[in-house]
């Protein structure tokens, strides 16, 4: 997964 797709932090 790209870091730019880390909009949600579970």
UniProtKB/Swiss-Prot annotation:
GO terms for cellular component: extracellular region. Keywords: Secreted. It is found in: Secreted. Expressed by the skin glands. Its main location: secreted. It comes from the Eukaryota. This is Skin secreted peptide P1-4. It comes from Phasmahyla jandaia.
